[in-house]
Amino acid sequence: MRRANLLILISLIAAPAVAQRINIPAEVTDEAALPRVMPRFAKAVIAFQQADQSPDPASLSRAQLVAGLYSDALASLGKLRAPLVNDPSPRVRARYLEYVLYARSRLTAIKTKTAFQGAYRETFHALISPLDNKTSALAVNHLSFDNLSQASQALEQDLAELKGKCAISPAESFKLISDYNEREVYRAFGSTSAELIAEDDARRYIIQKDVMAAMPDGGSICALIVRPRDRPKLPALLQFTIYYDQVTLLRDARRSASNDYVGVIGLVRGKGCSRGEIVPYEHDGADAAKLVDWIAAQPWSDGKIGMFGGSYSGFTPWAAAKQHPQALKSIMVGAPVAPGIDVPMEGNVVWNFIYPWPFYTTTNKALNDEVYYDRARWAKLDHDWYASGRPYRDLEKIDGTPNPIFDRWISHPAYDAYWHSMIPYKEEFSRISIPVLQTAGYYYGGPGAAVYYLSQHVKYRPDAEHYLIIGPYDHLMAQRGTANPDGDVDTISGYTIDAAAKIDLTEVRYRWFDYTLKGGAKPAILADKINYEVTGANVWKHAPSLAAMATEAARYFLSADLAGFPDDAYRLGTAATAAAIPLSVDLAERRDVDAQTPGGGVQDKALDSSNGLVFVSEPLAKATEMSGLFSGHLEFTANKSDFDFQVSLYELSPAGDYFQLAPYWSRTSYVQDLSRRNLLVPGRRESLDFRSSRLMSRQLQAGSRLVAVLSIVKEPGREINYGTGKEVIDESTSDATTPLQITWFGGSYLDLPVHR
């Protein structure tokens, strides 16, 4: 055994630096052998790190924990925590405490020759109990036994990827050690953590679970309430949600209470302890408003309530605001959905990924993880539906399980009265006088419907106190920021996030409500109504409106001239040309059902031009900032009554990297009016004017080119429009007897928002 360990150490130290590979024992993939193999491997990695002139102290401390070198680990953790303990951010102050707690407990157990659990209790009381509420609320999140499942899954994935390998990179080694350490820490804490956290909570807070809040119609809402013990009356912060995860929701309510608010979680009817049918969206506004009234009448309430949440829980504050409850004084939402606008469809084109969601949220009192995360089932559904060419309405028949909620949604393809009833509509926005803060991201599901809500609010109420924070975030980061327990998320889908964009939006939440409910200072980041990070420039900018993000529009025409780079691309030019460009798409073709889509990253070496045309500009003479919403004018003839199209914008850097800017897609018949379908006349020259609802902000490099991909939506993950003019959900490949033929005319252009 010692000889094997020595050989590993020798191979590590003697290996050429350029190789940067660390040998791993074959037993590392054997779960039963891990307690014996991993400490030995960790010591080898420590030797590797010590040969480095600047070892990463966080990685080193984890390796020391796995190796059983607890005193060394505490020394490393002490160096990590020394500059953090007096930081103004409680998130920073709480960093690495779980590892300190684990190492101290192990040392105490060894020195006193007692069981770990007893040492853990003693160390918890010594380390966690003295913390202030804000820091402890974050620290205990990292001690929960509920984290074990996620840690175990991460380790299982690591081990699966190691099969057949005899050496791995330093990064892979550190990840393996970190994930193994994480699992062992949570295994050791076990159920004792829950007992200790409950004791600590009872000392700091009054927690009421499964509170039945009576509604005027005889129904009830299930609520969780957490309030500080030493404060008789406080403003309340309400999150009204369909996502009933007891652990996560208690953390949110505790976090609010730690910031001197009453934290209230309200669940939609039928969830948790309440009775009734679970119906997403349709009744949430009225119920949330009544819950606001109920909270205001409680003896611990000072009568002022704020609402917050993200995604679905970002929709509910808007739904409540539609009802104008008197006690609702402020809202903050992240990547909020707007039913009928961005879910279950965007641009009136339905997304398949929404299909499993009703099963996830409505089939039990909590959440149906087993069904929702059955990725093989949903991938097969997409594949089989697309390959079959059957109508979109047949998704539930192909899946084999009725999905009445999804069926009801897709039966409303226009933004009609069904959707209007759920959130403010047109002039109803004019009556929303409370302050609003929205947070959003540029990428994937990051925008939510934030731009829609903002645009409508300021259109109908120009003096609205409505702020937006937006940066290089996806759906989750748009709600929380880049903060994670050990620091910040560094990348998003291949793109390295600017340092300036690394912010904790949850901290902003409490500063926002301090400002709007307690008369505190406005958060510094809200220097103007629109607050946006310019990617690539590493700077935040501020503007009074969306339009003011740009100083001019740069017009680029879709030219029939070849660009010469890449080979099959057309020119994105600054002058109109007379020539037209044909595009033919066989909507019945299914040989691409198993095709791997190229590109897709925020920063990538490829892009997807399937069923479309690529347009490329000349290199930019100098660095150029593009910030705001892009728009376009398309002139064309088509041989069908309708089609779904997409425009995707990219920066192509001199190094050959594609950077996402912004996409736009829509059903042609709804571009003019989301609420009313306007079909094309086949063969007649038509024109469309559109504006994106997704913001972009990027500093493009000198020498970069602009790339626009104009394509037809035809893929396994979205509804397919076959162009007959009848209801799209009833169309099939039998309606695609002839390919879609479009002629794009030279008068077509894109207006891109430039700031000089």
Segments predicted by a language model, with ranges:
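A catalytic-pocket lid/entrance helix-loop region that shapes and gates access to the active site
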Residues: 308, 315-380, 442, 461-510
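Accessory cap/linker subdomain of secreted extracellular hydrolases
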Residues: 132-185, 196-199, 322-324, 330-430
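Cap/lid segment of the alpha/beta-hydrolase catalytic domain
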Residues: 227-296, 481-493, 609, 641, ...
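C-terminal, loop-rich substrate-recognition/catalytic regions characterized by aromatic stacking residues
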Residues: 390, 483-756
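Active-site-adjacent alpha-helix of alpha/beta-hydrolase-fold enzymes
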Residues: 448-467
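Alpha/beta-hydrolase fold nucleophile elbow
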Residues: 299-312
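Short beta-strand/loop motif that positions the catalytic acidic residue
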Residues: 432, 438-440
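N-terminal cap/lid segment of alpha/beta-hydrolase-fold proteins
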Residues: 191-232, 620-622
